[in-house]
A protein has these predicted regions:
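A short, charged
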Residues: 128-139
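Segments surrounding the PLD/"HKD" phosphodiesterase catalytic module and close analogs
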Residues: 101-129
Length: 139
């Protein structure tokens, strides 16, 4: 995994002072099962993010999570379904919901912002950049 993402997550963990949600972090087997269930192959950086940062409690961003019981209010499966109803492109995967808008990872690993008004111009080259410029900066 790229050092940039590892570094961004370490910074996020330090800033959160160890605060995490009660949602357990997924392992590789569960992520693979979840991918099959939702019909979407996750980008490798997103898998790493899920396993190491999806339960961090910091600032105002609330990343989407994958859970065994599928009932969390920030459940990825639900966001995929809702996002598709609102017009998110089918090859974009929501990673964070923000007041009805979504940050999504595209097939090339770029993060794009999608609002209820449609595709926005805001984008970040990868998850690490999004963590630093959005989650941490707006925290």
């Amino acid at each position: 995994m790229g050092g940039k993402l590892i570094e961004a997550i370490q910074e996020l963990k330090a800033l959160s002072r160890g605060r995490v949600t009660s949602t357990p972090l997924p392992d590789d087997d569960f992520i693979s099962e979840y991918e099959s269930e939702v019909g979407f192959l996750f980008h490798e950086e997103y898998k790493y993010f899920l396993k190491h940062a999806s339960n961090i409690f910091f600032g105002t961003k609330d990343p989407l999570v994958v859970t065994r019981d599928r009932t969390d209010r920030s459940e990825l499966r639900n966001a995929i379904h809702e996002g598709r109803e609102f017009g998110i492109p089918h090859d974009w995967l929501p990673i964070c919901e923000d007041n009805g808008d979504y940050y999504c990872i595209t097939p090339n690993g770029q993060i794009r912002f999608w609002s209820g008004n449609g595709v926005e111009k805001e984008s970040w080259k990868d998850i690490a950049t999004w963590v630093k410029e959005v989650w941490i900066a707006e925290g």
